Amino acid sequence: MQVIETLAEGLKREIKVVIPAKDMQDKMNERLADVKDKVRINGFRPGKVPAAHLKKVYGKSIMAELVNEIVREQPSAILSSRGEKSATQPEIAMTEDKDEADKILAAEQDFEFTLSYEVLPPIELKSVKGIKVTREVIDISDDEVTEQVLKVAESARAYETKTGKAANGDRITMDYLGKVDGEAFEGGTDQGAELVLGSGRFIPGFEDQLVGVKAGDEKTITVTFPADYPAKNLAGKEATFDVSVKDVAAPGAVEINDELASKLGIESADRLKEIVRGQIESQYGSLTRQKLKRQILDQLDEMYKFETPTSLVDAEYNGIWSQVNNDLAQSGKTFEDEETTEEKAREEYKTLAERRVRLGLVLSEIGEKAGVEVTEDEMQRAIYDQLRQYPGQEKQILEFFRSQPGAAASIRAPIFEEKVIDHLLTEIDVTDKKVTKEELLAEEEGEAKAETKKAAPKKKAAAKAEAADAGEGEEAAAPKKKAAPKKKAADESAE
């Protein structure tokens, strides 16, 4: 077998592989000898079929098997012998001419094919001792815990039907039909809808006009959708809602006690407070971790500048761009609404894709050198977490992970990345800094605003932008969730 390099430009490689017809003939004869005593052909005793007849009957099918085996097995062997790793699966090209193909299968012509691929760039790791980051630390006060527990209590409070007029804080149960220009519109109708007056859940003006209604009342409400309402067909439009009030209920007292905890399935009020404190710590910890990670990745980005495989960048960019367009379509907005243009947005996301690929390769190299591994238990827990997100689809999800090799990689990549970050935190200079809740959130909001000005509408998963959330190359798409119930048009939470 001859292996001839025909292209070596940057990271691009093209290899021509030639297997002489005689070698193919020899391999075929070996296979024919193996099957000689096993096949049954009319007119011949077992093991007595002439070689020429065997070749005539089975030659082409055996050669086709050999060709498939060579194409399946040799690319990885060739790359290994060259000391190369391909960024993606090599592209394989062979003759499409029928006459040439027939000659190859008849062992009358050399079998040739071409491998085209990009190699992963060599990365010489640098010392991370110079990386300095600040870890923001927050002390969670008892008052903040109590405030959150009160919100839990309010959401779990009981309501009791009353006969009087509805006031702010009361919960009404209603049917409604929304119309624009006299025509009903999608999402504008509901039955048995519950609304706490004064909650601000519905569009401005809707709740105010229900103050004073009683059970059994019929009322037509006129409101105007906000100019920035996500559904462009409704934004700025005047609408009427025919409302039929079914029930008015007054709120019960909000008390933090063991009875409340029991209602929530928790043993005591003290335990409820512990759980809420843990949730707050987790939320702040997640935000602190994200900002800490961003600092590390920003500095790694400055340290490493090298050519990235176009195939990986294109795959990353296409994933981001697809999500960006989906987000725009769902929100009914355009690039102009986001104070940018499609051209500028493409440039921004191309840069983001390059950064993510480059950082992914760097983190991969750091992790490999440090011996970072994702354990089977960690993979199983991650897959279980995925199953919990798709109730009723557990079997399909498990089958997806079994049948799609890339699916497991998509689960492994973020776990591996976080473990590499954990490793780096033991190697770099980390300074803890106490901050208030307001300082932490104010800084985060400031960063978000700055991001919005310089980039196009953000992809929720991909546009961690400067955080880079660097994945390891192309990841398999996860199974889609079942669509969530649509928000009603009057409901402000739809925004």
Swiss-Prot record:
Annotated segments matching region Disordered: 78-97, 441-495
SUPFAM superfamilies xrefs: FKBP-like (SSF54534), Triger factor/SurA peptide-binding domain-like (SSF109998), Trigger factor ribosome-binding domain (SSF102735)
First-level EC class: isomerase
Any GO molecular function: protein folding chaperone
Entry keywords, A to Z: Cell cycle, Cell division, Chaperone, Cytoplasm, Isomerase, Rotamase
Compartments it resides in: Cytoplasm
Enzyme nomenclature, EC number: 5.2.1.8
PPIase FKBP-type domain: residues covered: 169-254
The protein's role, per its UniProt record: Involved in protein export. Acts as a chaperone by maintaining the newly synthesized protein in an open conformation. Functions as a peptidyl-prolyl cis-trans isomerase.
Family listed: Belongs to the FKBP-type PPIase family. Tig subfamily.
Protein name per UniProt: Trigger factor
Source organism (scientific name): Rhizobium leguminosarum bv. trifolii (strain WSM2304)
